[in-house]
């Protein structure tokens, strides 16, 4: 260790002899400023990259549910869902095939479907959407025969998106209100 300090001192002495101590201080300051600028640019670039991915996740997620619900194309979930997707519902739904079957109930159970995202936000790999679902119950919905009643419910979903795939969803809505609108539960 002592040798290292001695060598370091000798190198500094040689550089001072060549350039003068004022030049070293000036050069060190310039190097420090350049290093700080480089660090700042790197942090800014990484932050911009993360913000760009967050914006992509938000756009992707909105597009998926517009296509699935409004256009009735449940096949979109083949590319949008991760193979091991988890839907935190009652009961818990796991796997892409089961998740597709779950959402197919909404497409086959309701005509005149409208899925409107009222507000959405994202941070990192999480997307949150506040939504409104409207439709007429004209088909079988999770075993419930058509009631020909209109529904208009609001809810919120928290989703996780990893590598461009939806890996997890948690939906929250007033199920009592939904069942009352279907005429299944009394008001």
Predicted region positions:
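Short, solvent-exposed coil/turn segments at beta-strand boundaries
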Residues: 77, 124, 159-166
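Bacterial Sec-dependent N-terminal signal peptides
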Residues: 1-51
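Exposed beta-sheet edge and beta->alpha loop/turn motif
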Residues: 135-163
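Low-complexity, intrinsically disordered terminal/linker segments enriched in charged
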Residues: 167-187
